[in-house]
C-alpha cells in the first residue's frame, strides 16, 4: 500500500517508502541495546551508580566479583547468538557516533577493528569483553552456559549483568 494509507495506522510510516511513495514492509518492533542487570547484586557489590564508561563497567564487574558470589558478566557464550547478535548490535552509531558507519562505511574502512585511540569503534567495544574475560569477570566455563537457565540465575542474584536488548526484560521477569 501507499505510505499515506498506512500513516493513519502506523507511526513513522513515511520512513518506510521507496522513491514512488510505496511501502513494501513494516517494522514490527523496536529494541534498545544495553546491559540487563540485577540491581540488588550491584548494590551488594557497593556499586550505587550505573557505569557510564568502559572503565567504570569493568570496575563494577570487579566489585561484583570481589564482594558477592554472583557471576559479574554472564556471556551466554554457548548459545552463540548472544555473543554476535548482542555485542555486534552496539557497533555503528553507538560505538562511533556515526549512524552510517556500520552499514555504509565499515566495508570501506581499511582497518575497522583498529584502536581509534579515543574509546570509540569496534576495538573499544570488544576490548570491554576482552578485559572482562582476561580479568576473570565472566562465568568459569563459558562453553557450558545455559540461556534458559540464566533467566532464573539473574533473578536469584547469581548473575550481575548480561549484554542484551530491551526485548529480554520480559523473559527475565517470567
Stretch-by-stretch model annotation:
Residues 1-32, 97:
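Hinge/lid segment of periplasmic solute-binding proteins
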Residues 24-25, 66-78:
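Bilobed periplasmic-binding protein-like "clamshell/Venus-flytrap" ligand-binding domains
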Residues 1-8, 93-124, 174:
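Short, solvent-exposed loop/beta-turn-alpha elements that line the ligand-binding surface or hinge
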Residues 1-9, 40-52, 153, 160-161, ...:
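Extracytoplasmic "Venus flytrap"/periplasmic binding protein-like
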